[in-house]
């Protein structure tokens, strides 16, 4: 796959500028290359491609290393002790203790790649399996089955220990985690309440990948009355609710108004989750209702409520327009510029929709219409919020990234920067500095410098949490606040989380000292270091002491990178399913767009990518089989 991407990049470099679409150029137009030769050359695209090629080559070599590690792991037939905490606390084992919290995209990528021969690896999560979250919408209507998009965490790395439990507290200073063993609900398989034992787990390095939860945005009634689509249990609940609505609407003695209300499904949020659920649900209604409930066809309707002016704001404008047209052609009622005021019950939602004057969207005259929708189900896909443990950590850690427009001023009477302090007792030059994504320190009042993001752990370019003892706590995925080289905040997507997890695993496998200090140096003894309130250091990149000491073999293994490269996110594009065999596919490599497709071609790309990105051959086969089964026999609407 890496070679294919490199080939695509080289082919893309041949024209001066790529064509967006063959339909854009009139038939009689002169050749594109001749038209562009008169324009001045812009060096920035070439520089972007050079950086992208460098990243692609690096990722390709990384993949080769990972393959050798996997082959060695397959050949290893050793069996670890059944009591993983006993082995974890074994003082005679010289390997560092690596604690991984979570079982999402970041944690799964990390566990799959990390070398468990170098670390005592322990994964803790209330969920014992990984979920391919982009296909949760498909599983909620029976297009694919739940088990086809899940993989046990233990299967990702047999040498890594796993505990199904909840981390109730995490102290980054003492490096201690309070773990309650058992799933998040505290229930056994028979549904009985069970108070799981709590243990104190000490670690040397912790990777925090706990993700996020669905956000209600403090709107009354959302938590009590809405369905979500964040976990597998959410997809199961949606599937049961939709199937139950069809059965109830087909019962005798109901009025047309009652049937129409029961079969009106409201989806809040016009991002990828909301749009894909609308597409899958419209497919389900066409398939199931026309096949098994023909009299209910006139009553079924999907309503999409979105606060913005366009759905799927992450995509190109032309693709956003195509998405809106496709949804409406599928009989999805799209309500733009509409915000939810409250949710009174599972059958009643109150909105306010923006209405512009005669001048359209640019008109200064704006009014709000209050609307009430009667429905049978409300699915909430309007954003996410931090997990409870993340909020606790954010409050506990020192805030090392105050807002850029309110920096602390240094004490002008002090002759030594190390002696100047602000009201909190911290050195003001610490607040006046900030890491950029390329590992450089710049002034905090510079344009585009990252600042703290509410509800997320701020990390440096090597994904170390700022405010914790350096190199002991890292954060990846949705729970982290990480910035790209241009100073923009990386999105909370599976693509970002998976790349971060793989990056941290390779950082650990290569033996970098995450503290970045000279060998044997104490944190406070490093010259010029920036310290937080706890004396924790945030200055130097991870370094290989063996390579610094002149170990040629280690230097070659690191490809000359004595100091670790900062994390670089490689954006490969966006995908979204719209229903009816149509999808959006925005394919890119870094900042360089390769193609943008909608309709059946986009659908083919969407399915191809999702099959390739499955985490195991088992899930890859099951997803293909489910698609074939649905095509031949339709979706299963059993209420279970």
Predicted regions and their residues:
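N-terminal chloroplast transit peptides
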Residues: 1-25
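N-terminal plastid-targeting presequences
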Residues: 31-99, 103-110, 116-119, 147-150, ...
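C-terminal, flexible cofactor-proximal segment of oxidoreductases
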Residues: 43-85, 95, 505-640
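Beta1-alpha1 glycine-rich phosphate/pyrophosphate-binding loop at the start
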Residues: 44-50, 54, 58-67, 71-72, ...
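FAD-binding core/adjacent interface of flavoenzyme oxidoreductases
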Residues: 46-74, 83-90, 95, 160-264, ...
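A conserved beta-strand/loop element that lines the FAD pocket in flavoprotein oxidoreductases
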Residues: 159-171, 328-343
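FAD-site-proximal beta/loop scaffold in flavoenzymes
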Residues: 224-254, 373-506, 527, 532, ...
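Rossmann-like dinucleotide-binding core of oxidoreductases
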Residues: 259-335, 491-510, 514-523, 528-529, ...
């Amino acid at each position: 796959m890496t070679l294919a991407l490199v080939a695509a990049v080289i082919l893309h470099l041949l024209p001066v500028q790529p064509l967006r679409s063959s339909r854009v150029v009139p038939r009689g137009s002169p050749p594109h290359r001749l038209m562009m030769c008169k324009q001045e050359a812009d060096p920035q695209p070439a520089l972007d491609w050079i950086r992208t090629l460098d990243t692609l080559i690096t990722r390709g070599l990384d993949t080769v290393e990972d393959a050798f590690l996997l082959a060695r792991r397959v050949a290893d037939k050793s069996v670890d002790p059944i009591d993983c905490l006993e082995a974890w606390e074994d003082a005679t084992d010289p390997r560092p203790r690596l604690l991984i919290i979570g079982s999402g995209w970041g944690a799964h990528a990390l566990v799959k790649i990390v070398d468990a021969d170098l670390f005592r690896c322990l994964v803790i999560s209330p969920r014992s399996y990984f979920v391919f979250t982009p296909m949760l919408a498909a599983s909620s209507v029976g297009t694919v089955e739940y088990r086809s998009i899940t993989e046990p965490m233990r299967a990702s790395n047999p040498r890594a220990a796993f505990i199904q439990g909840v981390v109730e507290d995490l102290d980054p200073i003492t490096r201690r985690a309070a773990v309650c063993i058992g799933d998040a609900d505290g229930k056994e398989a028979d549904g009985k309440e069970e108070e799981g034992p709590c243990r104190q787990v000490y670690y040397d390095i912790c990777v925090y990948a706990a993700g996020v939860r669905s956000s209600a945005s403090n709107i009354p009634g959302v938590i009590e009355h809405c369905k979500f689509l964040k976990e597998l249990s959410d997809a199961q609940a949606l599937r049961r609710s939709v199937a139950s609505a069809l059965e109830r609407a087909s019962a005798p003695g109901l009025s047309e108004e009652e049937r129409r209300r029961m079969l009106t499904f409201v989806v809040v949020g016009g991002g990828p989750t909301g749009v894909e659920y609308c597409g899958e649900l419209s497919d389900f209604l066409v398939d199931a209702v026309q096949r098994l409930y023909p009299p209910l066809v006139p009553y079924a309707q999907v309503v999409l409520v979105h606060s913005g002016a366009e759905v799927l704001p992450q995509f190109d404008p032309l693709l956003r327009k195509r998405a809106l047209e496709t949804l409406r052609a599928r009989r999805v009622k799209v309500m733009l510029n509409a915000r939810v005021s409250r949710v009174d019950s599972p059958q009643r939602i109150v909105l306010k929709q923006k209405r512009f004057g005669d001048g359209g969207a640019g008109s200064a005259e704006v009014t709000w219409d209050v609307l009430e929708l009667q429905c049978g189900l409300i699915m909430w896909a309007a954003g996410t919020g931090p997990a409870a443990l993340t909020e606790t950590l954010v409050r506990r850690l020192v805030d090392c990234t105050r807002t850029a427009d309110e920096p602390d001023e240094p004490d002008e009477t002090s002759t030594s920067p190390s002696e100047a302090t602000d009201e909190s007792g911290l050195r003001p030059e610490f607040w006046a500095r900030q890491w950029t994504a390329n590992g450089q320190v710049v002034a905090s009042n510079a344009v585009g410098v990252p600042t703290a993001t509410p509800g997320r752990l701020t990390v440096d370019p090597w994904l170390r949490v700022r405010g914790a003892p350096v190199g002991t706590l890292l954060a990846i995925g949705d729970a982290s606040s990480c910035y790209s080289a241009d100073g923009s905040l990386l999105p909370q997507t599976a693509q970002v989380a998976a790349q971060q997890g793989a990056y941290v695993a390779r950082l650990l496998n290569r033996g970098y000292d995450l503290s970045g200090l000279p060998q044997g140096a104490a944190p406070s003894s490093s010259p010029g270091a920036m310290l937080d309130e706890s004396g924790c250091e945030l200055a130097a990149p991870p370094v290989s002491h063996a390579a610094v000491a002149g170990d040629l073999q280690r230097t070659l293994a690191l490809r000359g990178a004595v100091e670790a490269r900062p994390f670089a996110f490689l954006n490969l594009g966006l995908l979204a399913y719209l229903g009816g065999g149509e999808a959006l596919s925005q394919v890119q490599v870094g900042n360089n767009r390769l193609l943008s497709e909608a309709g059946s071609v986009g659908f083919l790309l969407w399915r191809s990518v999702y099959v390739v990105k499955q985490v195991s051959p088992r899930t890859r086969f099951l997803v293909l089989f489910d698609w074939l089964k649905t095509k031949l026999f339709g979706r299963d609407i059993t209420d279970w």
